[in-house]
Amino acid sequence: MGNAAAAKKGSEQESVKEFLAKAKEDFLKKWEDPSQNTAQLDHFDRIKTLGTGSFGRVMLVKHKESGNHYAMKILDKQKVVKLKQIEHTLNEKRILQAVNFPFLVKLEFSFKDNSNLYMVMEYVPGGEMFSHLRRIGRFSEPHARFYAAQIVLTFEYLHSLDLIYRDLKPENLLIDQQGYIQVTDFGFAKRVKGRTWTLCGTPEYLAPEIILSKGYNKAVDWWALGVLIYEMAAGYPPFFADQPIQIYEKIVSGKVRFPSHFSSDLKDLLRNLLQVDLTKRFGNLKNGVNDIKNHKWFATTDWIAIYQRKVEAPFIPKFKGPGDTSNFDDYEEEEIRVSINEKCGKEFTEF
C-alpha cells in the first residue's frame, strides 16, 4: 500500500472512531432513559399478518393520523412469561429504542395494554432476504459482498456499544425499497461487557463456543457473519443436518467444505471467520473489525459509500406501493384480544 493510500486508510479509521464515540453518547442517553408508551392500539388500523412466532405476530398496520404504514410486533405477555423470555423481550425494546444506524430497522412507537406488548417499527416492504435467496438459489459474490458489508458496519456499530446481536440469519434481514438491508428482531440482542453464557440463536448459525457452553463474547457475531456469507454465496449453510445435535457436531469439528465456485479470497475470508480458535478468529484480534474490512475479498468495497447508501444495490425488490405485502407470505389472521384485567403487570413495568 502506498503512503497516500495508507494515510487515507488511517484518517478513515480516525473518523470512524469519532463517529462511534458520538454514536455511543447518543445511545447511552436513550439506554439510561428509555421512551415508554408513545402510542396506543387504536391509533392504528391493522391490515395483515406478515409473520408469526411462538409468542406473538407481526402485522402490517396503518397509522390513522399520518397514513404511514408500519410493522407492528405484538407479543402476548402471558406467553412471553411462560416461555421465560421476559428478559429477552425487555432487552429487545430497550435496545431498539436506543440504537440508530442505517441498516437497523427503526422502532417508531412502543406501548402495552392488559394483554400485550407492542413494538411498532418501520415497514420494510421488500420482505426477507431468506425468501429472495431461496428463489434465486444463491447470490453472486458481488451481490453477497454488498449485503455482507452492511452487516460488517452494523456489527462494528453494535459492538462499539457493547451489544451482541446473536441472531444473524437470512430470515432476520429485510430488503428495503433501495435494495439495502434492514436488520430486524433484536429478541436475542444483549448489552454485555465481557462474557455471557446464554444458549440462544439458530442451530446452523451458532458459534462453537456457544455450543460448548463456554462463556462467549461478540466474536460469536463474526462467526455468524461467516455462516451468512457462506449461505448467501452457496445457497445453503456450511453446517447442516437433519437434527440439531448433528449440526453441532459439524460446527465444533472445525471442518468446512467450500463449493468449487467460491473464489480463493472468499474461501480465505471464511476460513478466518469460521475459525473455531478464538485467538485466530477475524473480528476478535487486536485489529478488530479492520482485519475484515481490509481483507482482499472486500478490496473493492467503499465502506463510507455503503454507509451513506450511495452504492447501487444489485437487486431492488418489486413492490407496488407503500402498503404492498406481496413479498411476504400469507398467514391465518387472528383477532387481537385484550383482557379487561391486567396480565403480568409487574414483569413488564419497564416496557
Curated annotation (Swiss-Prot):
ATP binds at residues 50-58, 73, 122-128, 169-172. Its EC number is 2.7.11.11. PROSITE patterns: AGC_KINASE_CTER, PROTEIN_KINASE_ATP, PROTEIN_KINASE_DOM, PROTEIN_KINASE_ST. It is found in: Cytoplasm; Cell membrane; Membrane; Nucleus. Belongs to the protein kinase superfamily. AGC Ser/Thr protein kinase family. cAMP subfamily. Phosphorylates a large number of substrates in the cytoplasm and the nucleus. Phosphorylates CDC25B, ABL1, NFKB1, CLDN3, PSMC5/RPT6, PJA2, RYR2, RORA, SOX9 and VASP. Regulates the abundance of compartmentalized pools of its regulatory subunits through phosphorylation of PJA2 which binds and ubiquitinates these subunits, leading to their subsequent proteolysis. RORA is activated by phosphorylation. Required for glucose-mediated adipogenic differentiation increase and osteogenic differentiation inhibition from osteoblasts. Involved in chondrogenesis by mediating phosphorylation of SOX9. This is cAMP-dependent protein kinase catalytic subunit alpha. It comes from Rattus norvegicus (Rat). The gene is Prkaca.
